[in-house]
Amino acid sequence: MSLIKIDQKAYEYNLRHIAKKIGSFQRLICVFKDNAYGHGAKLLAPLAKNLGVSFVAVKSEEEAQEIEEFFENILILSHRPHGNENSRFIYALNDISQVKKYKQDIKIHLKIDTGMHRNGICVENLEHAIDLIRSSDLKLTGMFTHFASADEMDGSFFVQKENFQKAKKIVKKYFSNLLFHSHNSAALFRGKIPEDEYCRVGLVQFGYGDSNLKRVLSLYAHRLSQRILQKGQSIGYGGIFTAAKDMEVATYDLGYADGLFRYNGKGELVLGNGKVMLGKMSMDSFSCENSGEEICVFKDADIWADFFHTINYEILVKLNPNIQRVLV
């Protein structure tokens, strides 16, 4: 049975490193959306709580309910208002037209569009948005934005930072004691975080984005069968790989149905133990040189991301939630 191992010490090390950069665990918002980027939100929640994290962000109400026992504050980022919101949670207000659709007395964080143009209210429309919120029964407790290019060396990051500062000045005229957060994983190590802000950390908490961090997740598969592949014999669909000599091969219990990108047999896809995948990946299995009962498929998503010309996020979040995840 395939298995995901979560390195508890590595995760705790990363959070301590991040908290030191920010100033405290109290200013840290751990983003646990999409099953904590494939790592297992319910598995990691008690670890974060025990270190002092009290604020997390998720995608939906369903995700919030899975971990609500662990955290005092849970922000739901991608909610479509339905009028029956849970007062236990905080909801992102992504569009000003949604103000009247929320249940009364619900806590909200106002999303500001500072230049990404995906969700949120433009700074130019902020005064109008504030008027609508003040005339409603919603409880504005925070305001935030998202940087589109914090990991790229262009000027848009600084433009967005300036726009958010403008938005903060405006909203502070009408509300006090708001919680602000703008810096995401990519922005965390790119400069000083304003003293009046929290920091949302996503993939960086799992060891990506800074060389001082440690990878948390490693993916393993277990052997289904083994055989001697004789010289000239092929393996898998289409016979893409043909043995140049007699070799001992094995089939392992992980395939593209488990959320992996489908390897088509072209190029060398290096596994976590240094072996290469042989032939096309099947729905529920793959083959390689016999590596024992258990094989590490990957422990660094960057390697697979480079091979498949994508980003490490996509490699990790696609991992099937039904794969067992254990702390090691």
Curated annotation (Swiss-Prot):
Pfam family, one: Ala_racemase_N
Entry annotation: catalytic residues: 33, 237
The reaction(s) this protein catalyses: L-alanine = D-alanine
Gene Ontology MF annotations: alanine racemase activity; pyridoxal phosphate binding
InterPro entries xrefs: Ala_racemase (IPR000821), Ala_racemase/Decarboxylase_C (IPR009006), Ala_racemase_C (IPR011079), Ala_racemase_N (IPR001608), Ala_racemase_pyridoxalP-BS (IPR020622), PLP-binding_barrel (IPR029066)
GO biological process: D-alanine biosynthetic process; peptidoglycan biosynthetic process
Residues annotated as binding substrate: 118, 283
UniProt keywords, alphabetically: Isomerase, Pyridoxal phosphate
GO cellular component, one term: cytosol
Pathway note: Amino-acid biosynthesis; D-alanine biosynthesis; D-alanine from L-alanine: step 1/1
Cofactors that this protein relies on: pyridoxal 5'-phosphate
UniProt-listed Enzyme Commission number(s): 5.1.1.1
Residue positions, PTM N6-(pyridoxal phosphate)lysine: 33
NCBIfam families in the cross-refs: alr, PRK00053.2-2
Stated family: Belongs to the alanine racemase family.
Function description: Catalyzes the interconversion of L-alanine and D-alanine. May also act on other amino acids.
Protein name: Alanine racemase
Organism: Campylobacter jejuni subsp. jejuni serotype O:6 (strain 81116 / NCTC 11828)
